[in-house]
Structures are given as structure tokens and as C-alpha cells.
Amino acid sequence: MWTAVKNDGPPLHYKRKIFEAENPAYAGSYCVDFVTQPFSETDETLPVRTTYFSDAEYEKFGSSDTRPMLVALHGLSGGSYEVYLKHVLAPLVGASGELQWEACVVNSRGCAFHKITSSVLFNARSTWDCRQTVKWLRKMFPNRPLFGIGFSLGANILTNVCLYT
């Protein structure tokens, strides 16, 4: 009820990357939204304050910095736009200096306005998209310590990632 009558939470801005599943057993795509600096462009097909990376932005995306990176997993039918999730991310990414974090949200298949491209959806044992994202993050940001947080079903997925990785 609280999220239905209040505003949409902290005004976080996201850039979206679409990933194609590497494992053919789980064919299809999913998306990851990365918290970014505010921008003015809009995309009516995505949640508010979310756009896709441009080719030029994506070319410059990797980094060798040591800033901590939080990987968040939303609850059932949620996404990066959820108020509860934004209230966790905002103080971390909004801090200054050495206290500032980077963050991304792994949106489960069919969530956060991402088109379903597979007959494989998600459940608590659906670790493949999160594991692929972590592998990709380690390559793009080799010096960043990675941390994870999950909410509801996302917490179950994260627990299984930790158990089976």
C-alpha cells in the first residue's frame, strides 16, 4: 500500500544493457539496468528514467577502478523501478568520494518492461542470468569488489547463486 500512495522513490537514472543467454539450454534474453548520472532523454517503452546505452556510451563503459559494485535482484514481477530497491541503492550511489558505490539491477526475464524472448522464465533456481552477469562484470570491472542484495524471490535466486557458484 505504501508504494501505491507515495511517489516513485529516489530519482535514480538507469542505462539498460540487453544480454543474450550464453547457455543454449536457457536461450533468450534478459536485461540489466545500471545506475548512471542523470540524463534528459526518455524512452516510453522503458520504466521512467531508463534508456538504453548508446553505442558510444557502451564503448567507454568498462573501468579498472576499485569502487564497490552492488548487484541487486528484485522480487517477483518487479524490476529496477521498484521503490524498495531504489531506496537501498540511492544512498550508496549518491555518496561522495571513496564511499560512493556503483550499482546494477539484474531484471528477470519478462520483468521491467523487457520483452519475453524465451520459453524459460525464472524461479528460485534460475541462477543462469545472474551468474552470466557476474562473469561479465568481472571482465568489465576486474578490480571492483562485487556485492549482492536480493529481495523476496531475488534473495532466493542470489542464495542459490552463492550456493552453486
Q: What residue spans do the PLM features occupy?
A:
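Short, surface-exposed "cap/lid" segments of acyl-processing enzymes
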Residues: 35-117, 136-139
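An N-terminal hydrophobic leader/cap segment in hydrolases
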Residues: 1-63
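Alpha/beta-hydrolase fold nucleophile elbow
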Residues: 140-152
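Alpha/beta-hydrolase active-site loop
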Residues: 120-141, 160
